[in-house]
């Protein structure tokens, strides 16, 4: 599997699908430029998504919300306090690690610490003698939360009043514009609002190649429905998404849907799941 993946990466780089970002200046880790073929491929996927999710369903509309939003949006959504990763430093080699990923890696994925408290993760790492993957040491600092949003400043002053964030997801723009869309298009629920756009997350442990990058593009739709019908609609859209992926060429034998356990759900969710393809996870 690893050799096959390496061949795919090599082919993508050599044929103009993807280039290393800032390559002639030494590159910048976790950044990638899409070449001519890469752009065409992305555009075809986005066109297919727009056609299936927006154009073929009269209940759904598309918007383009701003990347920069009033910080009160992120305060109201809980991102300022809750959108964070649990980090530990190795005191021996000074490397930084996500506590949850240390546990998942050490247990070969058999233990999922999502929803655990910092204390529970610290105790598990200590009791199971989980070592630093870089030096093999067992001396970690206490866990602290690191916010994943990129912070910058609006205007000429760099102070608290000028603080602004690059959006970590596209969803909030659709929530904020819900009333505007409903009024302008005289929509009645159920209906969906979709958009395609860039999002940014200051990932501590980015993934391999173009997976889990700090700058990425999302195709997302928020579907608004009457209370009490949400689980029915969830079931409908879950199958809809799976059908869309297989129609794009995904092999059904290599795909499965995993419902998240209750302890994995964030405070905003009643139900959630993900499509899993050969251990590569694509969030629904």
Indicate where each model-derived feature is located.
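TRNA-recognition modules of translation machinery and tRNA-sensing kinases, especially anticodon-binding
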Residues: 2-284
């Amino acid at each position: 599997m690893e050799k096959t993946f390496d061949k795919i990466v090599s082919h993508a780089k050599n044929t103009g699908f993807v280039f290393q970002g800032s390559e002639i200046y030494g590159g910048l880790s976790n950044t990638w430029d899409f070449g001519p073929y890469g752009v065409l491929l992305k555009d075809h996927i986005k066109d297919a998504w727009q056609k299936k999710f927006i154009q073929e369903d009269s209940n759904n509309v598309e918007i383009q919300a701003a990347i920069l939003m009033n910080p009160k949006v992120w305060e109201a959504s809980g991102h300022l306090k809750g959108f964070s990763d649990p980090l530990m430093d190795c005191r021996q080699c000074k490397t930084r690690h996500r506590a949850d990923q240390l546990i998942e890696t050490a247990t070969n994925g058999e233990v999922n610490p999502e929803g655990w408290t910092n204390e529970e993760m610290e105790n598990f790492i200590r009791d199971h003698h989980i070592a630093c993957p870089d030096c093999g040491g067992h001396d970690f600092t206490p866990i602290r939360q690191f916010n994943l949003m990129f912070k910058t400043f609006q205007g000429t002053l760099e102070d608290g009043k000028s603080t602004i964030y690059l959006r970590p997801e596209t969803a909030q723009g659709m929530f904020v514009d819900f009333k505007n869309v409903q009024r302008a298009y005289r929509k009645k629920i159920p209906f969906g609002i979709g958009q395609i756009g860039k999002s940014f997350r200051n990932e501590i442990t980015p993934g391999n190649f173009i997976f889990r990058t700090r700058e990425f593009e999302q195709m997302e739709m928020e579907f608004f429905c009457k209370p009490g019908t949400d689980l029915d609609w969830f079931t409908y859209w879950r199958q809809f998404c799976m059908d869309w992926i297989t129609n794009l060429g995904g092999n059904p034998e290599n795909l499965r849907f995993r419902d998240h356990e209750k302890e994995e759900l964030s405070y905003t969710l009643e139900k959630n799941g993900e499509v899993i393809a050969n251990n590569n996870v694509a969030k629904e």
